[in-house]
């Protein structure tokens, strides 16, 4: 019995090492612009459930890199990765729902996935979710929540979020109107 458990553990470690090696080889090929090789290296580990590889497959299908452009296939790969907690995949699902790429446009789903990603610190998701609160798209308009989210993204030096914070202070939306504070945020964005 112990031998069986030990062998299972060794096989699992071996498979995990292979999956990681495939992912790293695929990532290196992707960074060199060799997308066909990237797909060939990443797909096996994606099919074995590696969330980073699943995200990579989604990215390549979304951009038509090494595979034909296919938003539905990109969505499917992003969903597999997002369900395992990958913040970048969650952000991409939010964007696909927000733009109606690969799925019907659904602002409530966009908000859901942006929020999951934003809670993990993804500044793009924080900004996009903040924009949805600012405009009242998929959520009730809430300038204070928009300011909170923009600030989180701005703290990560996202220039458009810095600019958005300037706009909120200039207009007094969700924060006290303060032209000096607006100027400070605008200068940081420049």
How should these model regions be labeled?
Residues 1-7:
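Bacterial N-terminal signal peptides that target proteins for export
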Residues 15-21:
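Sec/Tat signal peptide C-region and signal peptidase I cleavage site
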Residues 22-29, 41-45, 56-63, 92-99, ...:
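Hydrophobic face of amphipathic alpha-helices that form TPR/SEL1-like repeat modules
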Residues 8-9, 19:
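Cleavable N-terminal signal peptides
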């Amino acid at each position: 019995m112990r031998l069986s458990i030990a062998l299972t553990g060794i096989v699992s470690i071996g498979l995990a090492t292979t999956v990681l090696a495939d992912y790293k080889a695929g990532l290196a090929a992707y960074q060199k612009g060799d997308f066909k090789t990237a797909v060939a290296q990443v797909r096996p580990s994606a099919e074995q459930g590696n969330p980073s590889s699943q995200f990579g497959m989604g990215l390549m299908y979304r951009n038509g890199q090494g595979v034909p452009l296919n938003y539905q296939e990109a969505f499917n790969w992003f969903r597999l990765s997002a369900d395992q907690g990958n913040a970048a995949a969650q952000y991409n699902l939010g964007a696909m729902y927000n733009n109606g790429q690969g799925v019907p446009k659904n602002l409530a789903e966009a908000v859901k996935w942006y929020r999951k990603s934003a809670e993990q610190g993804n500044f793009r998701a924080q900004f996009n979710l903040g924009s949805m609160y600012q405009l009242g798209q998929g959520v009730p308009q809430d300038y204070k929540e928009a300011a909170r989210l923009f600030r989180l993204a701005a703290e990560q030096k996202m220039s458009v979020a810095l600019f958005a914070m300037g706009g909120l202070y200039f207009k007094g939306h969700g924060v006290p109107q303060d032209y000096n504070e607006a100027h400070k945020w605008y200068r940081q964005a420049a």
